């Protein structure tokens, strides 16, 4: 496979939008519930095998970078950490149908859209690599992770070793409270997809049971607490049982892109 790095000027962005009107477009992100994601992945695989649809585009988040077995002739990935870029490249020509598969790494800096937070740190670590680095070389990946975790000391940014360093004062309880493998302030919301609303009615009638909650997990979307508060302010959320929330405004969940955090009522008012 090969990589190309391109800077995307604003004129090319608008041109790409026009070109993308051709063919079939599908979306994949965690704003879709697991059942919706699974259905879309099955649809993508079927379309890629169907020769009557020569152009199939999937606009996706990092969701596709691990554990999603789909094969495209070309991949475009916004600049990010080297590990994420290689994961995205793994969806390109993975079945070897073409002689070479190409992954384009593009920058939206001209659009003032640059990575932030953890993505910014990962992207900067990649940019610190020598310009002639072979991204497929394992030693390059070793150097990348050194840049990411060792130079900036981001591997232990919670300073966990401070609580576990002194054998005479091992603060296990404090370390346990501070440790988070994944920083997660998510609130789960049951959305309207498939037979989810029928299951919600059963939940109201029969109460919370393990088999029922296991079924409902397929129709759940996790959002940050700040986004959850937005949806509550729109009047789009109902607490059906303590700690169990349902998206009651069906317009907030789109059949193509999943849960929307925008206030569609405000948009409708602006259109009047």
Where does each model-flagged region fall?
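Short, surface-exposed connector motifs at secondary-structure boundaries
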Residues: 21-24, 68-74
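C-terminal helicase lobe and adjacent C-terminal extensions/tails of nucleic-acid helicase motors
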Residues: 6-11, 15-28, 32-34, 38, ...
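Conserved RecA-like ASCE P-loop NTPase motor core of nucleic-acid helicases/translocases
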Residues: 1-4
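Conserved helicase ATPase core of P-loop NTP-dependent helicases/translocases
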Residues: 33-61
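Structural motif
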Residues: 57, 74, 102-104
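Beta-edge loop/turn motif
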Residues: 55-64, 68-72, 187-192
